[in-house]
Amino acid sequence: MAIKILPPQLANQIAAGEVVERPASVVKELVENSLDAGANRIDIEIERGGVKLIRVRDNGCGINHQELALALARHATSKIATLDDLEAIISMGFRGEALASISSVSRLTLTSRTEEQHEAWQAYAEGRDMAVTVKPAAHPVGSTVEVLDLFYNTPARRKFLRTEKTEFGHIDEVVRRIALARLDVLINLHHNGKLVRQYRPAKDESQYERRLVSICGTAFMQRALSLSWQHDDLSIKGWVVDPMNTEASGDIQYCYVNGRMMRDRLINHAIRQAYQDLLRGEQQPAYVLYLGVDPHQVDVNVHPAKHEVRFHQARLVHDFIYQGVIAVLKQRGSGAELDIACCEPAPAWEPENRPSAGGNHFSRQSNATSVAASSPKEVLSSKGNMGGSRGGENRQYHGDHYQKRQGEVYQKLMQSEPEEKRELFPARTAPVMAEKATSAPVQVKNSNHSFGKVLSIYSPCYALIESPLGLGLLSLPVAERWLRQAQLAPTEQGLKSQPLLIPLKLSLSKEEAGALNRYSDLLGSFGIEASVSHGKATLCAVSLPLRQQNLPKLIPELLGYLAQQPSASAEQVVTWLARHIGSEYETWNVAQAVQLLADVERLCPQLVKSPPDGLLQLIDLQAVVASLTHE
């Protein structure tokens, strides 16, 4: 094949593979553009988890009419102009790829107006060459980006999106991080026409605390220790939670570098080392930290989603964070200021960072100031030192043991005896006619133990099947529930546990924790392994049918159900789980229905012979035939 330049749309779609991972990625890029435009109010409207619509409206500076078409072109940006600008990034965006990439996998419309213009203009790109069309529009000062039908032209990408609830949960988390980074900006988040989140701008100390409480919770603020420390061009501000307070949530782990959300290994390692000797059992550190670094001493152009950075003086930054955090943790009891010089040196850290470009910018001698308690207003007086990441994404675990156990399970599975192959869709032996449909159970006399052939999907969740007895509608959710019930039925050895890659923290009530201890053996037979320590429950493993479920919601609900039972049997747990486990699909296609029925026929052959109520209903075609023949 000859070498040739790719069409603009295809090139943009390739770039979108890195920039646009899911709807939350689009929201992040658009909101960051609004912040770079100087907006102090951002309205976000979402429909169907962002798949149908993402609309971000701001009151920023807007885009000039002459530059509007360039805004949708690749590598066109107002953020940088020279290599020196790239080596000292102070804006959120700088590559000029986001809008072009998003417009190549959606129907994007950009409407904007500057204060100098008397009318607004609207731009959109379409076609193979991504030609931009600009036309007049009505709009106040600022910009609105509307993204319709995300991944409509890349069905493979759209197929791997999760449910509407899951995708909106990712969007909600992104907005939460940005709201914590910029407390001075009003952010409204709507979903399906309803106001879900409203983060009001903070102007004084009480408003700072109120907004932080709305994001991090009251428990975090009540137990947080304020941190403020500066050394030359390095500064760290924020809050760390006293590890002696066992009720503090380890899920709150936000870290920001020069206003950018970060999940950096070096920063995470420094914080965990500071907490190392103070955590008990399965405790996790909780913190909100804002790190300020000279832009010339940090490279943000090392990760497609800008979630990681590289520090030119990595060792100095690591020790600076370590000493600042451990100092405020050690002074928590006495309330007196602690001299930084008395802290022990930080444990060894060997990051994979590039060498320093030029001389050591931080090599000048300076007396480090002591860690001083400060108010939220003082900590956040500079709105540039912000960005965030959740705790679950920062935690590091040694997974060799887990991988070994998973490998053993996989080998045993592969060594099992293969089943006798049989035809999924047997040849039809009777005409497509059926007796008049009744509410009585359908009796299917079929030696092949097959429901028949799936012809089509009716509505969102019914399969139209052709069986030897005629046509019928089969409820796929009911079939899925019976399949789960068969999969969850414990054997003499119990269901095989599969360790979670990252153990899951659960917040349980006293009744739920009591049920966990009381029914630990029963839960173990279903592959559910959990432990309680210091008032917190840790879920370590579940069986295969439960791995893809919403475990933080499912397990507490199961424990709540067990807490209400004077005694519980395995059959009760199986029935409860089968009814409460979420369906893998909201809408079905023929391939998914075929796979489901094949599994049901293999594990539940009795359902083929005698389908229960609500599973299968034959269709009476006699009336239809009579109407067509005018009889």
UniProtKB/Swiss-Prot annotation:
<dbReference type="GO" id="GO:0140664">
    <property type="term" value="F:ATP-dependent DNA damage sensor activity"/>
</dbReference>
<dbReference type="GO" id="GO:0032300">
    <property type="term" value="C:mismatch repair complex"/>
</dbReference>
<dbReference type="Pfam" id="PF01119">
    <property type="entry name" value="DNA_mis_repair"/>
</dbReference>
<keyword id="KW-0227">DNA damage</keyword>
<dbReference type="Pfam" id="PF13589">
    <property type="entry name" value="HATPase_c_3"/>
</dbReference>
<dbReference type="InterPro" id="IPR042120">
    <property type="entry name" value="MutL_C_dimsub"/>
</dbReference>
<dbReference type="InterPro" id="IPR014721">
    <property type="entry name" value="Ribsml_uS5_D2-typ_fold_subgr"/>
</dbReference>
<comment type="function">
    <text>This protein is involved in the repair of mismatches in DNA. It is required for dam-dependent methyl-directed DNA mismatch repair. May act as a 'molecular matchmaker', a protein that promotes the formation of a stable complex between two or more DNA-binding proteins in an ATP-dependent manner without itself being part of a final effector complex.</text>
</comment>
<comment type="similarity">
    <text>Belongs to the DNA mismatch repair MutL/HexB family.</text>
</comment>
<dbReference type="GO" id="GO:0006298">
    <property type="term" value="P:mismatch repair"/>
</dbReference>
<dbReference type="GO" id="GO:0030983">
    <property type="term" value="F:mismatched DNA binding"/>
</dbReference>
<dbReference type="InterPro" id="IPR042121">
    <property type="entry name" value="MutL_C_regsub"/>
</dbReference>
<dbReference type="GO" id="GO:0016887">
    <property type="term" value="F:ATP hydrolysis activity"/>
</dbReference>
<protein>
    <recommendedName>
        <fullName>DNA mismatch repair protein MutL</fullName>
    </recommendedName>
</protein>
<dbReference type="InterPro" id="IPR014762">
    <property type="entry name" value="DNA_mismatch_repair_CS"/>
</dbReference>
<dbReference type="InterPro" id="IPR014790">
    <property type="entry name" value="MutL_C"/>
</dbReference>
<dbReference type="GO" id="GO:0005524">
    <property type="term" value="F:ATP binding"/>
</dbReference>
<dbReference type="InterPro" id="IPR002099">
    <property type="entry name" value="MutL/Mlh/PMS"/>
</dbReference>
<feature type="compositionally biased region" description="Polar residues">
    <location>
        <begin position="362"/>
        <end position="373"/>
    </location>
</feature>
<dbReference type="Pfam" id="PF08676">
    <property type="entry name" value="MutL_C"/>
</dbReference>
<dbReference type="InterPro" id="IPR037198">
    <property type="entry name" value="MutL_C_sf"/>
</dbReference>
<dbReference type="InterPro" id="IPR038973">
    <property type="entry name" value="MutL/Mlh/Pms-like"/>
</dbReference>
<dbReference type="InterPro" id="IPR013507">
    <property type="entry name" value="DNA_mismatch_S5_2-like"/>
</dbReference>
<dbReference type="InterPro" id="IPR020667">
    <property type="entry name" value="DNA_mismatch_repair_MutL"/>
</dbReference>
<feature type="region of interest" description="Disordered">
    <location>
        <begin position="353"/>
        <end position="398"/>
    </location>
</feature>
<keyword id="KW-0234">DNA repair</keyword>
<dbReference type="InterPro" id="IPR036890">
    <property type="entry name" value="HATPase_C_sf"/>
</dbReference>
<dbReference type="InterPro" id="IPR020568">
    <property type="entry name" value="Ribosomal_Su5_D2-typ_SF"/>
</dbReference>
